[in-house]
Amino acid sequence: MKIFLIDIDGTVCDDIKNEDSHLFSVAMPIENSREQINKWAQEGNIIFFFTAREEEHREVTKKWLEDHNFIHHGLIMGKPRCLNQEDEYVWIDNRKVRGITYNSIWGDLKEVEKKILTFGD
């Protein structure tokens, strides 16, 4: 089983910033995002959406996910925002973490070898 933490804006729908929150309810899903995420859920994986949207936008976000039939098990609001293209997230955990940078195409995951950051020996 995998636990997926999936961003919303720019990953499963149009890239809308908090400053344009009036557009959250009319965002369009990105092609194949729902199908792929729902497939993972139906395979027994856990789906959490992890978004930089603010807590005050929880209800409109939940409604959007429901209206567009995204299977999910939870919604985490308030992810720290990367304000520049050069910014990146670094997640440190005592469990295995796999990072996937969404690059505009949804589909099955494939295994590749990459150079990663790690602590010393």
PLM regions and their residue ranges:
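HAD-like aspartate-dependent phosphatase fold
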Residues: 1-121
